[in-house]
């Protein structure tokens, strides 16, 4: 991850578009849904649902195109258009929700009509208030917050303009540096982008709460928890149950990693305390794969350094293109030297070519199991590398532009393993889009939002060391126990390390929406949860002037995050089911479904359902069980768990919570 979590996927429903894409999308005035008749009947309800599907389907391409432009060309003009269009879209949504109330309680509704009426009510992460002025303010704030994140930069003291650093540049430091000062500076630099968002986010949350209350919910958090075919209270209990299943594995991993970091950094990492968040190889400490070299169990058991191979491929391509360019330039301009701009254009060309080649590696896996090739327009219209001439929202996302074959990915691919896995993840969204496009518009979303995030990650579980060797990304790998533990450690640093982070983001938001965390305590509440669940602390002292949640895209982008926690559980269930369908015999961690059409057929059958039925029905058809369950992830990592317990014998695992969550890793505890 391998920061795939990353993925603000654009779900294919007008309601979910407003939720999942950070997209308060613009558009021209929409055809208003027909008002419900005074004495509504089941037939009227069916006609109403059909019209909602038709109206939303007609409006969707324009909204999505406008949102694409707003995220790829961040200017005051595109933000204004985005906000105004978002206001119109929220108005249509508000009308549909209000009109749907006329059909509540009808006894003879067809099941598919009843389900779609429910989806109209709960599918949006941004419930619009009925007051037009509040809707306008909500749309404007959403657009502003999203744009501030995309344009965010850190200017070191005394620096400005071109010397300021964007997220990509700061991530290069966090991901690869081992200099504690450089790491702390980069971490604090990026987290400073959240500070200007704090007041706006408070207003934004308040306006969303107004909309949620009008729908009959206590707050937005309760509305979000209602979207899982169970009561909000039952869903909260379900996430806690799943966390309890996997928590022991996380705590063993934390204990082991903390010990290794203590060996590296000394007392900066307390032997039995919280880990500073900047030392884990990821800007948000959500996945720890970039510190694999510091914690690798057996250094003599072969290399799994995919990033070095990818970087070498990129460098070879760059060298080839530069030689060709210089030869061509010398012939055309004798005695002259190319400008910096000329060389920058060559570099951008190389980045684009490399990015396309990387995307084709991912596409090849999907087509090998029987899914169709992507249309040529995918490579023509996707943004796969950071432009040199403008700010963009580089956070990886997948887009279904028109529900008629125009699918795209927006992502700034880099030559490293993180980007390789992220493109596999995003392509999972793309194929989900294409598979459920035959469903009515309201069903064109995941069975639940965790399903959408799990599709591509299920595929990455087949990127075993043996598979990576076959495609030339690692040297010959051994199949002995040392090599197995190394491979499991590498994967656990992403898959297991992420689990508490995936849960706590929405724990914080739910508490904010309910008022349990007040505006005055935003940062305190944030770090209290990060310390409680992850066992990490801010590397530098924080205050309530800061707004560290704003440094994570999904908060200003308003993308619910529990989906990622769920996806990291169910992707192992999916993987196990597909391995069974493929006839694989062996340990789950060794399964690779590449090229297996039987597994692909079973996968496609699930993808085609979209949200047309309660998710337990969809899950049961693939896995044979109606319950999300952590047993597959525990089975997968059983060898590593045994190793970790052995290594942690005699250590004081776990951590105490500090008296002051904002004070950093060395603050007193009680």
Provide a role label for each language-model segment.
Residues 17-20:
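C-terminal motif of bacterial Sec signal peptides marking the signal peptidase cleavage site
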Residues 235, 239-249, 446-484:
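Post-HExxH zinc-binding segment in Zn-dependent metallohydrolases
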Residues 415-426:
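Short alpha-helical catalytic segment bearing the HExxH-like zincin motif
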Residues 22-25:
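Bacterial signal peptide processing site
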Residues 222, 226, 412, 433-458, ...:
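Post-HEXXH active-site segment of zinc metalloproteases
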């Amino acid at each position: 991850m391998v920061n795939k979590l990353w993925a603000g996927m654009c779900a294919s429903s007008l309601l979910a578009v407003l939720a999942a894409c950070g997209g308060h999308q613009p558009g021209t005035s929409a055809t208003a849904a027909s008002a419900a008749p005074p004495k509504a009947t089941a037939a009227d309800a069916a006609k109403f649902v059909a019209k909602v599907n038709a109206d939303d389907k007609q409006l969707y391409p324009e909204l999505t195109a406008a949102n694409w432009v707003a995220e790829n060309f961040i200017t005051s003009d595109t933000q204004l258009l985005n906000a105004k269009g978002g206001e119109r879209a929220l108005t249509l949504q508000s009308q549909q929700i209000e009109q749907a109330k006329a059909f509540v309680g009808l006894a003879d509704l067809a099941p598919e009509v009843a389900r779609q009426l429910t989806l109209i009510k709960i599918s949006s992460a941004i419930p619009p208030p009925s007051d037009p002025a509040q809707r306008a303010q909500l749309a404007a704030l959403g657009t502003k917050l999203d744009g501030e994140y995309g344009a965010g930069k850190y200017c070191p003291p005394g620096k400005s303009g071109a010397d300021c650093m964007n997220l990509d540049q700061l991530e290069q430091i966090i991901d690869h540096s081992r200099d504690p000062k450089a790491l702390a500076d980069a971490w604090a630099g990026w987290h400073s982008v959240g500070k200007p968002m704090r007041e706006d986010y408070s207003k934004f949350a308040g306006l969303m709460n107004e909309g949620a209350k009008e729908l009959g919910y206590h707050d937005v958090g309760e509305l979000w928890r209602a979207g899982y075919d169970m009561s909000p209270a039952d869903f909260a209990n379900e996430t806690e149950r799943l966390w309890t299943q996997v928590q022991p594995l996380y705590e063993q991993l934390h204990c082991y990693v903390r010990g290794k970091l203590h060996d590296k950094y000394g007392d900066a990492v307390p032997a039995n305390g919280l880990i500073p968040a900047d030392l884990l190889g990821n800007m948000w400490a959500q996945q720890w794969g970039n510190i694999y070299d510091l914690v690798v169990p057996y250094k003599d058991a072969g290399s799994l350094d995919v990033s070095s191979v990818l970087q070498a491929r990129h460098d070879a391509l760059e060298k080839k293109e530069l030689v060709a360019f210089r030869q061509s330039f010398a012939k055309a301009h004798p005695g002259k030297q190319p400008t910096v701009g000329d060389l920058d254009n060559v570099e951008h060309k190389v980045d684009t070519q490399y990015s396309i080649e990387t995307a084709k590696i991912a596409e090849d896996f999907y087509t090998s199991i029987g899914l169709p090739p992507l249309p040529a327009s995918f490579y023509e219209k996707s943004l796969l590398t950071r432009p040199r001439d403008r700010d963009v929202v580089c956070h990886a996302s997948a887009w279904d532009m028109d529900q008629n074959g125009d699918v795209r990915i927006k992502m700034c691919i880099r030559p490293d393993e993180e980007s390789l896995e992220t493109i596999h993840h995003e392509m999972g969204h793309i194929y989900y889009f294409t598979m459920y496009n035959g469903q009515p518009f309201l069903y064109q979303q995941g069975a639940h939002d965790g399903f959408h995030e799990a599709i591509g990650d299920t595929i990455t579980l087949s990127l075993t060391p043996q598979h990576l060797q076959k495609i030339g990304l690692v040297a010959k790998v051994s199949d002995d126990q040392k090599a197995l533990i190394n491979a499991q450690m590498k994967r656990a640093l992403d898959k297991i390390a992420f689990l508490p982070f995936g849960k706590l983001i929405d724990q914080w938001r739910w508490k904010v929406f309910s008022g349990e965390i007040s505006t005055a305590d935003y940062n305190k509440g944030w770090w209290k949860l990060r310390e409680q669940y992850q066992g990490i602390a801010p590397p530098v002292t924080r205050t309530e002037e800061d707004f560290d949640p704003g440094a994570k895209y999904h908060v200003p982008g308003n993308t619910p995050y529990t989906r990622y926690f769920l996806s990291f559980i169910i992707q192992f269930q999916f993987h196990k089911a597909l391995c069974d369908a493929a006839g694989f015999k062996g340990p789950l961690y060794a399964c690779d479904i590449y090229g297996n059409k039987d597994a692909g057929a079973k996968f496609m059958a699930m993808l085609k359902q979209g949200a047309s039925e309660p998710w337990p029905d969809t899950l049961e058809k693939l896995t044979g069980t109606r319950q999300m369950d952590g047993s597959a992830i525990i089975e997968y990592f059983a060898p590593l768990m045994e190793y970790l317990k052995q290594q942690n014998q005699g250590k004081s695992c776990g951590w105490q919570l500090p008296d002051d969550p904002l004070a950093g890793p060395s603050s007193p505890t009680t």
